[in-house]
Amino acid sequence: HWQALAQKHDCALLSPTYEQPGKADCQMWCDPRNGSYKTFLKSLHDLGKMSGHTELSKVPWALWGHSGGGHWVGGMTMLYPNRVIACWLRSGVPMLEANPERPQIKPHDLPADVLKVPIMCNPGTKEGVTEKKGRFARVWPSNETFFKKVRGAGGLVGVSIDPLSSHECGNSRYMAIPWIDTCLFDRLSKI
């Protein structure tokens, strides 16, 4: 599915993964300001050089991330809004306000250019929407706060709650891919 989307738009598909060691602090990598953005930019440069497509270091991005990856792609959107075509946040969003319950998470600024980027928040219903207790119950309140802040500033943000899932990705790709496809079609034509 993802490969077909990339081929349709003549895009490169890069799927980095990171397995966090048990009890490690997610913020060390999922907040790109802690240095992971440098690794990403270097990987685009290196992949471009190795593949003979040096333009990879300069092309726009369509970003999708899950959990800490959602926080990360949202953070990259805050840092590089002029490079982002679309951003899909599955079960994780960057914080835009300080949370006294989670002081280790630094809030991001909301640059004006972010308001032009289509962003979709996609939590599972069992992440605080219909199930209010449990390990992932904080996901929906974080998404709701993010949504209200971005939409309140006039941003292009939506919410699509997966009606069947919790923190797993489930079948969310069946909505994410057509949404990103539409964003690519609309926004790439304007570059």
Task: Tell where the protein language model's regions lie, with residue ranges.
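Alpha/beta-hydrolase active-site loop
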Residues: M28-E55
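Catalytic active-site module of serine/aspartate enzymes centered on a nucleophile-bearing elbow/loop
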Residues: A176-I191
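Short glycine-enriched nucleophile-adjacent loop
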Residues: G70-P81
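The feature captures the conserved acid-bearing segment of alpha/beta-hydrolase catalytic domains
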Residues: I85-Y174
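Conserved alpha/beta-hydrolase
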Residues: H9-K23
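Alpha/beta-hydrolase fold nucleophile elbow
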Residues: H53-S67
